[in-house]
């Protein structure tokens, strides 16, 4: 029995008349990248989101509250919802059942005509038809009109007419599909964590909906996670602040509509210094911000300044806070739903609707102002926090000037310890951040000076999780990095000015090296996050061991490799093993051959796939709450490779 189907048979005039047809499907198999972005692992998972988005649309319209996603044996995907069921009556223009039109004609669906869905999610909106076209097999079961309807397809082509296969007292839709290996040549295997992260996010963004993910590929080890948040994004903010010290117990929360735009905002300040602002439009994470973010920021700054001056916490007009000051230590989520969202920007993740700015500004400012006057103690704490941030900003401005590099060609302002590369083309340039001066010397001698720059870092950099920007910019190692990268920092950050498109962290393979690596990643995440999002940050993989047998040398990168090599080698001639404790133990040639030569090296690219996990991990590892850190170490100690 399918658990997600609904007992309520409420079709509410959702029929073939609401299905609008725009164009044919022929192009989808020829040029799949145009419709789903790519045919890589990312594109494969996009197929799931296209089907899930349709179920979310039913939920947003008020007709579904349960969605189930199952990874079946052989990487089939099954998505079930308890909505009204896709219409099965004949669609007038095509003369075919509406469900068949939706699954075989590109851009045919309830989200395009305006009569079916008021608001719909999904960035591409390419819908079920493209999933069908890019699937080796697809099946649909519709529970509607007390009847179960069924149709099957191969590569988008119906195998038989829609037929009745049983009776039912439920409503809803079940779609099963298997991605076509001829199109997804890289992989057709789904990653549970990738699906889990987005499903949890969707459950937060659509409060009250229960979304279940189940992995049935291993019969003896079935995995299941179910997400249901009555608090919606309010619960999301509480989760993000879990390892922080909030300065008010409950997040400030608003959920209102104006001019057919639904606005939901949750905000909570904590004692830290980092800002964590996530924005969404129709469930799409708008990484590049947009008009909803602009309206929120404008209202926040104006209302806090107005309150600070009228309550005499701020003495004069000249004490006004900047936007950056008002957002210090703030965790906030903005989610809007719009009938016709306009996405722009480099990755189509920036909201462009100008009318949204005014609506968000008005709704949030009224609510926030009321909150401040009703909670004077919290209001004072927030304003005073902003005043402290303003003082730090003035101090940081002086320090920031020192880090400014006018352009990629500006050599005069470069830090003295930097051995820059001669190429001025950022796409081919890489900079190695090397632990210690001695290792820095070896890497400088062993590098390709045309494309590889070296910046030695002395000792551990500052833990930015516990510091304001003025203190951070007074740290010599951090200042040198900012100057070398050329991007600026914080509000001044500009990815287009990056001098290097590969920033490689190169530390010793011991506990100290791991700590320095974590400090650097914390700095990049908190103050230069676009570098990570653009895929510019890497971690070098220097060898752990050198195994010598006669004149033959083998470099080994982990214990598993070492065990494998030892089992394969002849016992004679006798071999010896040396463990590298640090980069400084390798000469220039060895460093080049094992760690820096693009032909042979292994680099780990740092990816940001789950903002919640990343934020919580950095806060827990580098923040003030010792108990959470201790628990993490105890839970993960079995995986650690400790070097005493």
From Swiss-Prot:
<dbReference type="InterPro" id="IPR018522">
    <property type="entry name" value="TopoIIA_CS"/>
</dbReference>
<dbReference type="Pfam" id="PF00986">
    <property type="entry name" value="DNA_gyraseB_C"/>
</dbReference>
<comment type="subunit">
    <text>Heterotetramer, composed of two GyrA and two GyrB chains. In the heterotetramer, GyrA contains the active site tyrosine that forms a transient covalent intermediate with DNA, while GyrB binds cofactors and catalyzes ATP hydrolysis.</text>
</comment>
<feature type="binding site">
    <location>
        <position position="508"/>
    </location>
    <ligand>
        <name>Mg(2+) 1</name>
    </ligand>
</feature>
<protein>
    <recommendedName>
        <fullName>DNA gyrase subunit B</fullName>
        <ecNumber>5.6.2.2</ecNumber>
    </recommendedName>
</protein>
<feature type="binding site">
    <location>
        <position position="508"/>
    </location>
    <ligand>
        <name>Mg(2+) 2</name>
    </ligand>
</feature>
<dbReference type="GO" id="GO:0006265">
    <property type="term" value="P:DNA topological change"/>
</dbReference>
<keyword id="KW-0460">Magnesium</keyword>
<keyword id="KW-0799">Topoisomerase</keyword>
<dbReference type="InterPro" id="IPR014721">
    <property type="entry name" value="Ribsml_uS5_D2-typ_fold_subgr"/>
</dbReference>
<dbReference type="Pfam" id="PF00204">
    <property type="entry name" value="DNA_gyraseB"/>
</dbReference>
<feature type="domain" description="Toprim">
    <location>
        <begin position="429"/>
        <end position="543"/>
    </location>
</feature>
<dbReference type="InterPro" id="IPR020568">
    <property type="entry name" value="Ribosomal_Su5_D2-typ_SF"/>
</dbReference>
<dbReference type="GO" id="GO:0046872">
    <property type="term" value="F:metal ion binding"/>
</dbReference>
<dbReference type="Pfam" id="PF01751">
    <property type="entry name" value="Toprim"/>
</dbReference>
<keyword id="KW-0963">Cytoplasm</keyword>
<dbReference type="InterPro" id="IPR011557">
    <property type="entry name" value="GyrB"/>
</dbReference>
<keyword id="KW-0479">Metal-binding</keyword>
<dbReference type="InterPro" id="IPR036890">
    <property type="entry name" value="HATPase_C_sf"/>
</dbReference>
<feature type="site" description="Interaction with DNA">
    <location>
        <position position="460"/>
    </location>
</feature>
<feature type="binding site">
    <location>
        <position position="510"/>
    </location>
    <ligand>
        <name>Mg(2+) 2</name>
    </ligand>
</feature>
<feature type="binding site">
    <location>
        <position position="435"/>
    </location>
    <ligand>
        <name>Mg(2+) 1</name>
    </ligand>
</feature>
<dbReference type="GO" id="GO:0034335">
    <property type="term" value="F:DNA negative supercoiling activity"/>
</dbReference>
<dbReference type="GO" id="GO:0003677">
    <property type="term" value="F:DNA binding"/>
</dbReference>
<feature type="site" description="Interaction with DNA">
    <location>
        <position position="463"/>
    </location>
</feature>
<dbReference type="GO" id="GO:0006261">
    <property type="term" value="P:DNA-templated DNA replication"/>
</dbReference>
<keyword id="KW-0413">Isomerase</keyword>
<dbReference type="GO" id="GO:0005694">
    <property type="term" value="C:chromosome"/>
</dbReference>
<comment type="function">
    <text>A type II topoisomerase that negatively supercoils closed circular double-stranded (ds) DNA in an ATP-dependent manner to modulate DNA topology and maintain chromosomes in an underwound state. Negative supercoiling favors strand separation, and DNA replication, transcription, recombination and repair, all of which involve strand separation. Also able to catalyze the interconversion of other topological isomers of dsDNA rings, including catenanes and knotted rings. Type II topoisomerases break and join 2 DNA strands simultaneously in an ATP-dependent manner.</text>
</comment>
<dbReference type="InterPro" id="IPR013760">
    <property type="entry name" value="Topo_IIA-like_dom_sf"/>
</dbReference>
<dbReference type="InterPro" id="IPR013506">
    <property type="entry name" value="Topo_IIA_bsu_dom2"/>
</dbReference>
<dbReference type="InterPro" id="IPR002288">
    <property type="entry name" value="DNA_gyrase_B_C"/>
</dbReference>
<dbReference type="InterPro" id="IPR034160">
    <property type="entry name" value="TOPRIM_GyrB"/>
</dbReference>
<dbReference type="InterPro" id="IPR001241">
    <property type="entry name" value="Topo_IIA"/>
</dbReference>
<dbReference type="InterPro" id="IPR006171">
    <property type="entry name" value="TOPRIM_dom"/>
</dbReference>
<comment type="similarity">
    <text>Belongs to the type II topoisomerase GyrB family.</text>
</comment>
<dbReference type="InterPro" id="IPR013759">
    <property type="entry name" value="Topo_IIA_B_C"/>
</dbReference>
<keyword id="KW-0547">Nucleotide-binding</keyword>
<dbReference type="Pfam" id="PF02518">
    <property type="entry name" value="HATPase_c"/>
</dbReference>
<keyword id="KW-0067">ATP-binding</keyword>
<dbReference type="GO" id="GO:0005737">
    <property type="term" value="C:cytoplasm"/>
</dbReference>
<keyword id="KW-0238">DNA-binding</keyword>
